[in-house]
Amino acid sequence: MDQAQLDWWRSAVIYQIYPRSFADANGDGMGDLPGITSRLGSLKSLGIDAIWLSPFMRSPQKDAGYDVSDYCDVDPLFGTLDDFDKMLATAHSLGLRVLIDLVPNHTSDQHEWFKRAVAAGPGSPEREFYHFRDGDTPPNNWQSMFGGPAWTQLPDGQWYCHLFDSSQPDLNWENPKVQEAFEDILRFWLDRGVDGFRVDQPHAMGKAAGLPDHPDVERAGAGFIEGEPSPPMWFQESVHPIFRRWRAILDSYPGERAMCGEAYVLPLSFMALWVRPDEFHQTFNFRYLDSPWTAKDIRKTIDESFEAFGAVGAPSTWVLSNHDVMRHASRMGGDFGRTTASDGVGPNDPQPDAELGLKRAVAATLFTLEIGRASCRE
């Protein structure tokens, strides 16, 4: 295998597939894995190199599959493990690589780990899989990204932490048993032949020792803002050794397996620390997605991206859309900031200019492809 094949992820065009809405093979109104398999030839004809599958693992579906109840099985909504294997084999026969979503910050509250923790009671080893704390009130001032306190109390009086929905308890990544369990999950999918992982919210996995209050109560439930100190629930240094071990696992498999982190950290020089040679292969460059559609802003983002990622020998990714924001054909048809782009446009909101948005989206896509090629020539 030559170096270009080994470094495929540096220049690959990766197409995101949202399984529930992509293609329905059995007519039940829900997209599924056989539906994806049936469309792989069409995707190949677009000139893409790989697909990334949004969550398809077993889940109660309270958060579109980002609440996983079994990391080593397929949700019946989408098919079976056999369907996955057939899809993977078909993709590989067409020369397409397959990356899958991995959600390590939290599980579903229906995962066996959490159900065993609840049943075992306070002080048990099972509860060490998560962040449980005693108290009459929430253990700190952290707020959920979905609203309200980031803590929910059980009938036995203990509280558990969830940076997202209360049905998504956060795992305790200081626990070696959690780390070992996820290393086994990585191997399960790598053994099946997947080419890598898109890792969801890796910057949320570590928590500051002692789970201290956020210093700014007004910001205790918000994400990161450039220029602010790192909050105690995001961007902890303790996660980096975990990802180095994951990288070593991927590197132990034949061919080049890759992982891309959804690490929304700024400035770009900070984001680049996640793609040092022994950690993630890539991370999503959301600065490019957020950049206003002006030559000045786009050039500034590109220059800063080349500088930051080049300093650690990594390529930048160039992202225009994903499942969390409006598609760029709509977004570029109006003056939409990131908040609107994430929340969408309602029927009573100012509507995008469809013709303008499509023209800009085509231009942006062609421009992005050329940036990718230029990155590989650097």
Regions found by a protein language model. Name each.
Residues 1-378:
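Active-site and adjacent substrate-binding regions of carbohydrate-active enzymes
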